[in-house]
């Protein structure tokens, strides 16, 4: 299972949604807002026949509280193989999640831009 965080036009905040089809994804979250990539990656996950858990955030990369609530909500779900947070390169959030990722042997999925932002912020 891959957990993605992202913006959407509908759906409750602070709730992890297990999604099994494209129809269910669109029915639950609607269309992605302009410049949002979370739903795009969620679609790719389903097209690659992977299980999906989607967590709606108010604004990708900026709704720190939404990310923290979401990370705590999915902390007990041990079937998650990877977590994707497009737009999120905040050092505090990444450092908080890293021990859990290592413990559960999960991957953190970055976009190239987010990885660059994270690495250059470390200097």
Placement of each model-derived feature along the sequence:
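Surface-exposed assembly/interface segments
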Residues: 1-123
């Amino acid at each position: 299972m891959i957990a993605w965080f992202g913006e959407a036009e509908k759906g409750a905040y602070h709730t992890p949604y297990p999604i099994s089809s494209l129809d269910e994804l669109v029915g639950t979250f609607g269309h992605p807002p302009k410049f949002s990539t979370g739903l795009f990656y969620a679609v790719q996950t389903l097209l690659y026949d992977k299980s999906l858990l989607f967590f709606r955030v108010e604004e990708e990369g900026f709704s720190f509280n939404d990310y923290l609530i979401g990370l705590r909500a999915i902390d007990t779900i041990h079937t998650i193989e990877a977590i994707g947070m497009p737009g999120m390169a905040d050092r505090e959030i990444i450092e908080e999640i890293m021990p859990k990722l290592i413990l559960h042997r999960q991957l953190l999925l970055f976009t190239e831009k987010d990885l660059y932002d994270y690495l250059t912020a470390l200097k």
